């Protein structure tokens, strides 16, 4: 038999309202349940059924499809758990009950209730199937599982894989049915529910439970159920009787973080004025929830954050801390607004107004569980949030009150499990009257007024006049002992009080909480880093940083040096071309001429050819000087400027007219040294204008005609060189300025990432 676990609330320990109590001595034994189920109910703390349990359990045991609506915290989980356990056939190892929940936390909580009530049932197997856990573990659990509880996504996956056999399922339960069946495009629950429902046997019983019953839920459930029976208590008044609801208007601002700061200040003031056991703070944004948890922890208030962005283990750990009273404040999104049962939570704060009235009712239902007393406070800005809050109050007929300022001390009617003493101090430091003897006196008086309580915790919350709230809590658990007789008489005289208060400074320091010095929280700065060391560290971070595996293809060492490294080979090659252009041209012209003509021309026109060659050499040199700077000019420039000039000249030469491109390609394939006798061989391969120029230079013509043709040729080539250089420069700068913003943004982003990583250390 499984160990019994307390799953019910103790009715005698706290005040209960009428919406969870029934008149008369009705007990669970009058509901005709099986003996193991009754034993499990008694062992887990269930003494008498609530009104919703009294009406719904008998109808469910008759096999009817039920739609159950009741207020938050009135025992709906116990309804379908009791019906499911009482209908099980333990000898059959197949899955007989399937329970779906909208969140993993609710599924885990349902599993705990089932195991607590079914603790007296020998051989009961109940398992949870949720995301974040290995599939192999789920397959192992499904070999013998009477009750399967899980989220729709994982259950659908197991059915598709064939691991979960649904042919023997006789009871299908939808907990928080309005959330599972809501018509929302952002939620895929409805599609998954339809798929799961279609795979189940036709002859089955179905239960749908929720604290809210919107109109859309009735339309959705009509598709699944056969003549369902409605079990609804106080449908026109969904609010809890023991819960006081307040709202507070905070100044609106155009910047969201300013509004958040205003709400946080009001929240800290509320925590310092209202004594509470545990509190739930709801935020619409994940980032704000985590930020608020950090702020409260820095103020000394134990706070834990839970959201959908955390891992499954972190989420379960946060819920365990809340239920085991390991944290005072839980900051959450709407992940825990439904179904979560924490008995000691008596304060709920909405940092943001919820999106709809259903979410609001579920949020405030986390306080005032099973008829207890509690307080709910909602912060809203002027304008849209205020109008939305008023619409919710009108829709649900809520008794919504404005939070008084200043907050009165008696706003929390129920006494807390630990006593909270609020003291106003003149200085932020710890006062002299903070003595252990006075705390013992306060404890003795409280134990005298409440002798039935075995243990309690004393918390001292101090508030400074200057507005800085500091909470110094000294939590001390006292064993069950009564003060000695005559003890209070000895403490009454003032002289004895002064004598007892004379405690050394060392003893007083020992009673205070041990907080590390401020220097231990600071990162010790080492020696100063030079720029070269910082550069090496930055490159190491880019290559070998956390989560990085970078292969360096090109290293940027500055604009001019980078251009030299990348294009250094091309620069040298182009310089060789410029210096050998004339030699290649002459050698190719000699190769193309016949031998006889070559000899005759060399004998008759040797002087003329030498003159024309000198003129063509001057022309080629002038052309090369227009695109390639002279050696003296390059020597005069700095090293970092030389590469830039060379690159610009290369770019200008690459855009020369098409008539010169084949010539350069041919020259690059030739050897640099050719015999001078082959100069005329290139004559037939030259373009038309070059042939004309060469022929006219060898003919005996007048000086005027030769001068005119030379001037026209030089003028034409100069114009072509000018426009080609102009286009080259324009294209270069267009491409450069087009990509420069992206290069700057990339560099800025990488530097910002590097700085952030350095700040962490």
Swiss-Prot record:
GO-annotated cellular components: cytosol; nucleus; SMN complex; SMN-Sm protein complex
Major site of localization recorded for this protein: cytoplasm
Compartments in which it is found: Cytoplasm; Nucleus
Basic and acidic residues composition-biased segments: 443-456
Region (Disordered) location: 428-525, 570-720
UniProt entry keywords in alphabetical sequence: ATP-binding, Cytoplasm, DNA-binding, Helicase, Hydrolase, mRNA processing, mRNA splicing, Nucleotide-binding, Nucleus
Enzyme class at the top of the EC tree: hydrolase
The keyword DNA-binding belongs to this UniProt entry's keyword annotation: yes
UniProt keyword Nucleotide-binding, yes or no: yes
Short motif Q motif, span: 26-54
Motif DEAD box, chain ranges: 175-178
Top-level taxon of origin: Eukaryota
Biased composition (Basic residues): 683-707
Record's catalysed reaction(s): ATP + H2O = ADP + phosphate + H(+); a ribonucleoside 5'-triphosphate + H2O = a ribonucleoside 5'-diphosphate + phosphate + H(+)
Pfam families named among the record's database cross-references: DEAD, Helicase_C
Stretches assigned to the Helicase C-terminal domain: 266-415
Start-end of Low complexity biased regions: 600-613, 623-635
One example of a Gene Ontology biological process annotation: spliceosomal snRNP assembly
The protein's Enzyme Commission number: 3.6.1.15, 3.6.4.13
Feature: compositional bias, Polar residues: 498-512, 655-679
Known partners and oligomeric status: Part of the core SMN complex.
Task of the protein: The SMN complex catalyzes the assembly of small nuclear ribonucleoproteins (snRNPs), the building blocks of the spliceosome, and thereby plays an important role in the splicing of cellular pre-mRNAs. Most spliceosomal snRNPs contain a common set of Sm proteins SNRPB, SNRPD1, SNRPD2, SNRPD3, SNRPE, SNRPF and SNRPG that assemble in a heptameric protein ring on the Sm site of the small nuclear RNA to form the core snRNP (Sm core).
Protein's UniProt name: Probable ATP-dependent RNA helicase DDX20
Organism annotation: Danio rerio (Zebrafish)
